Amino acid sequence: MIFLYWHSPNRAIFERSFFVEDASAETVIRAVSRWCVLDECGRIVPAAKVPHKETVLSEERAFTDQDWKIGEEIPLWEKPIYSMTVACSEYDLNMHMNNIKYADCVFNCFSVKELSARVLSGFSLHFLRQSHEGDRLDFYRHALSDSVYQVVGKCGEVPVVSARVEFCRAQTE
């Protein structure tokens, strides 16, 4: 079952939380969507000036900052593990790199052998900035423990995406 909960907008940011529950009402997927509205000059339109339907807000089910924030800093000694240049095939209708393409890049930071040997137990992705055609993105992977990794994608020195990848155990045959 899929549940959608709206958050109360602050002055500029709109948010929705999504939950997918299995048959035993256990949450198996959680996601949050955050966005703002820009005018034709690229300025943020205050939330109070954006027409929208009245919705039932469910703050008790909404994500907290701790649920979605992932660090953006990677130790200075880390070298890029994967790099790519954004091309037209990564674009979406909004004329920037499609969000799901970032997930592909994060998993390109692991070898097939590494992924085959483990079971994925958690994946969090935080989009920080848009990427456009011609941008060179460098992805850095840092082990936080034996089973938890942080991946940060940067355009130059600017982080554009941050991810947390968690494994629960070794894959059994």
Predicted feature locations:
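Short secondary-structure boundary segments
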Residues: 2-5, 95
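Acidic/His-leaning functional-site neighborhoods
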Residues: 78-166, 172
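HotDog/MaoC-like acyl-thioester-processing domains
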Residues: 6-76, 127, 131-133, 142-173
